[in-house]
Amino acid sequence: MATASNLGYPRIGAHRELKRAVEGYWKGDLTKDELRDSAQALRESHWATQQELGLDVVPSNDFSYYDQVLDACAMVGAVPERFPWDGTEVDLDTYFAMARGLQEKDLEGEESGVQAMEMTKWFDTNYHYIVPEFSHDTTFSLSSTKVIDEYEEAKAQGVDTRPVVIGPVSFLLLGKTQADDLDALDLLDDLLPVYAEVLQELADAGCEAVQLDEPNLVLDLSDAERAALDQAYEALADAADIELHVATYFGGLEDNLPTALDLPIDVLHLDLTRGEEQLDEALDHGVPDDLALSLGVIDGRNVWRADLDALLGTVETAIDALGTDRVLVGPSCSLLHVPVDLDTEPGLSDEMKTWFAFATQKIEEIVALAERADGHEDATEALFEKSRRAHAARAESDWINDAAVQDRVAGIDASMTERDSPHSSRSPLQREALDLPTLPTTTIGSFPQTDDMRRMRAQYKKDEISKDEYEDFIEEQIADTIAAQEEIGLDVLVHGEPERGDMVEHFGRQLDGFLFTENGWVQSYGTRCVRPPIIAGDVSRPEPMTTRWLSYANDQTDTPVKGMLTGPVTMLQWSFVRDDQSRAETCRQIALAIRDEVLDLEDVGIQAIQIDEPAFREGLPLREHQWDDYLDWAVECFRLASSGVRDETQIHTHMCYSEFNDIIEAIADMDADVISVEASRSKMELLDSFDAFDYPNEIGPGVYDIHSPRVPSVEEMEELIRTALDALEPSQMWVNPDCGLKTRRWVEVQPSLENMVQAAENVRERATA
């Protein structure tokens, strides 16, 4: 019979129980034992839920207090030397220190602090993992038995699970080496014995199969990296009497498919949502007789109810070729990336609820597909019929389908993505209109969010205060922020965004086509959870979104005020996106809505408008040969949003990451008049790519690190400005912080900005002398 399996379940709990427990421990409100009890209760609940839903293969060790890659670091003893660890078991405090760093008070005065390990995006998802660190001195030993302990814990509960572990090759490739002459794969020989020991201990505990995640198989790999996979699994296949199930996800294997199919393993998992063609490719290549395929047919990264009839055809294709005993049915990836349970959503209409499937509902779909493939039509027909009705309803829904929006997208032409004149002609007009000096100063948008702001927004949402009371408060905050900036001496001001919480949610709630959940939480990193909006229908803007507050801000000053908007690509990337049309089409709809807002801001006298695109690079496909298509439509959408204005109106954008070399041409094609970037920590190194490319427009490299509470001195910011001027012309450069100031306090922000303005004035005097 076909096997219903799962690769991973959300660990946070349906109501973010894990977040509260871990943060309670960090604050000292919970003891270690109380934290462990809370975690065990969550695990037991998750295993019971999945077993009751009918899964044949339930995962364990998918739970984590913080991150699964950090768990693997603890398992193999990959603890950087700067952390106080005695080389035995990695305890809970060492584990959290690796993720969060140590402050002086944690170290009893022995040191001033220990920096946390780096965190970065998990492939092209919105989850973040802790980056392993490797050096010539790195050694490995079994230093955490969590994977074995949790297998035994589940077994005691009556659930025989399949433990999940990051595979050894991906573990090394996901890390960073601390020496230029060290290749992470040089450590494979030392790492494999620890993995072999884990497999043997699992086998001794009665475990029959282990899931080894090798997501790097969907990336562009070198011959040496493919050889490392062969070496690793040849060794692990002989390590213990246990089945090896290798999971790949987030894309197709493409040229790595032969390597994966030839590994000495028992099951290979294929993502058939982002690599739907690879089942046919695998069957055409030839699947070894002793290899079963796990079919990732249920989308583990989106929230839509599956088309079960269509997916059944895929499952039956595999069964016809391999037989039912060699086919597993599962999600495309771990269900970590979707909310826990649709039944916790009281705010969605009954009709809308039928459109979606969260983790619990996705497991129901997996089980139904496996059972239907085994001929159990009567038992599964209700869910299949629910799937049919949902897809038919979406196709016919007036809420989803807006002919006016579709017609407008169809009418987009090249002229809508071009400014009237090139930047070289626009720039002098803008400098005159805005009365800008050399090296103008500004900020990125947000100012400190106080407890009062958060409280007033919450009270207004709950109807505890009137609209007039709320708006009076917001006006007061804006006026204070404008006055503070004038006192500091900034050249272009912002209104401070006191009315905004999340930068995507704020706009999404004002756009038709977006839906929001109450409990649709997913883990971003550690205890940080987010509720991504759902782009469910055609997107349009029923009325202006920001002109009310920007007009008020503009009336408070004679200094230019910059409008702040979230860009279409970022709105797309940080949402669950509809699956019934291309992402490019949805992005164009958002871009048209933002375009309308840009033009309205211009009409009310805002002459500088910033369209933030922090997620622009995140949208890059994992395979380089797919980049051009994405960059073509992503750049088009930014230009569609920004190109309707007059030459005198200055368009800014902001990107907060430091790798531009491989997309610098696309950034130039966006044709923003000014791009501000995070640069202070890298000491302006990222400007090398702008300099080498001869970037034509204006740049604001950050000179104030807003991620730290310290106040940078005038002298150090002067030095950064002068360093930047080695790569940029004075007429090309702006002076600004790295990012928005929302998370900082006024006592830090005020003196930091005063020093920044003074530094700019000092360098300006010399540059213009």
From Swiss-Prot:
Annotated positions binding L-methionine: 444-446, 497, 612
Coiled coil: none
Family under the similarity heading: Belongs to the vitamin-B12 independent methionine synthase family.
Cofactor: Zn(2+)
ATP-binding recorded as keyword: no
Region named Disordered: 415-450
Gene Ontology biological-process entries: methionine biosynthetic process; methylation
Protein name: 5-methyltetrahydropteroyltriglutamate--homocysteine methyltransferase
Superkingdom to which the source organism belongs: Bacteria
UniProt function note: Catalyzes the transfer of a methyl group from 5-methyltetrahydrofolate to homocysteine resulting in methionine formation.
Catalytic activity field: 5-methyltetrahydropteroyltri-L-glutamate + L-homocysteine = tetrahydropteroyltri-L-glutamate + L-methionine
Record-annotated active site: 707 (proton donor)
Cofactor note: Binds 1 zinc ion per subunit.
MF term (GO), any: 5-methyltetrahydropteroyltriglutamate-homocysteine S-methyltransferase activity
Organism: Salinibacter ruber (strain DSM 13855 / M31)
Swiss-Prot/TrEMBL keywords: Amino-acid biosynthesis, Metal-binding, Methionine biosynthesis, Methyltransferase, Repeat, Transferase, Zinc
Positions that bind Zn(2+): 654, 656, 678, 739
Binding site for L-homocysteine: 444-446, 497, 612
Amino acid composition bias (Polar residues), ranges on this chain: 439-449
Enzyme class, UniProt record, top EC level: transferase
Pathways involved: Amino-acid biosynthesis; L-methionine biosynthesis via de novo pathway; L-methionine from L-homocysteine (MetE route): step 1/1
Record has Transport as a keyword: no
SUPFAM superfamilies the UniProt entry points to: UROD/MetE-like (SSF51726)
List of residues binding 5-methyltetrahydropteroyltri-L-glutamate: 16-19, 121, 528-529, 574, 618
EC number: 2.1.1.14
